[in-house]
Amino acid sequence: MSGTGASADRGVLVRAAATTDDALVARLRVRFLADVRDLQGDDVSTAVRDATAEYVTRSHASGALRSWLAEDDGEPVGLVSLIATEVPPTPSDARPFDGYVINLWVSPDRRSQGVGRMLLDTVVAHGRTHGFRRVNLLATEAGHPLYASAGFATNPDVVELHLPR
């Protein structure tokens, strides 16, 4: 899949988001945040909404963020975004990028119908085509089976430190 024009028998089309989709991508990112944190949409602050819209616009314009939308008859039913990070070569792998998947979100009424798989396949294909070394993500418990079925594995070597505000 190239990331544009991928479709399923269900009539869902995955397409690359354009700059004219920035507001939609930001709104769907807020829905993703509300879903994974079990919030109502109104519980996401205006500051977070505004910062999200600014981030999406700035990052799409710079090329640091790519997003794809899943649509059914023109209506958005899913979103996935990818942050590309330039990385230095190693003796075993000189490819220049790692990808970090964010916002893999599917509308609740379209879950378990293959939309998430279409979005994931699209973002992985983009990584392969553009010389990414790896693609990683943080998974919800519900998302683990999808990612495992696509070949993703947990990495016990990853260590992180959350810094206080």
Which residues does each predicted region cover?
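Conserved GNAT-fold acetyl-CoA-binding loop/helix
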Residues: 33-55
